[in-house]
């Protein structure tokens, strides 16, 4: 951790700028989860469940 703080001091990056960047990055991760990961997971589970039901009802396994 000491190396990172030294790097920030050498690069003349303010703590507020670093904090805003970190908050933005976390916000991007949350937005990606909401917009991409959760709908894709729900779709794959839905398709998987329907395929399983179709294979079971037709007698093919």
From Swiss-Prot:
Protein name: Photosystem II reaction center X protein
The keyword Transmembrane helix is assigned to this record: yes
Signal peptide as annotated in the record: none
Family per record: Belongs to the PsbX family. Type 2 subfamily.
Membrane topology category: Single-pass membrane protein
Keywords (A to Z) from UniProt: Membrane, Photosynthesis, Photosystem II, Thylakoid, Transmembrane, Transmembrane helix
Places the protein is found: Cellular thylakoid membrane
HAMAP family registered for this protein in UniProt: PSII_PsbX_2 (MF_01388)
Classification lineage: Bacteria, Bacillati, Cyanobacteriota, Cyanophyceae, Synechococcales
Quaternary context: PSII consists of a core antenna complex that captures photons, and an electron transfer chain that converts photonic excitation into a charge separation. PSII forms dimeric complexes.
Pfam families, sorted: PsbX
GO cellular component: photosystem II; plasma membrane-derived thylakoid membrane
Role: Involved in the binding and/or turnover of quinones at the Q(B) site of Photosystem II.
Transmembrane segments: 26-46
Entry-linked InterPro entries: PSII_PsbX, PSII_PsbX_type_2_subfam
An annotated GO BP: photosynthesis
């Amino acid at each position: 951790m000491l190396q990172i703080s030294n790097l920030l001091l050498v690069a003349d990056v303010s703590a507020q700028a670093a904090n805003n960047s970190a908050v933005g990055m976390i916000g991007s991760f949350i937005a990606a989860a909401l917009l991409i990961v959760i709908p894709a997971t729900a779709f794959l589970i839905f398709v998987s469940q329907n395929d399983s039901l179709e294979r079971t009802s037709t007698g093919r396994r």
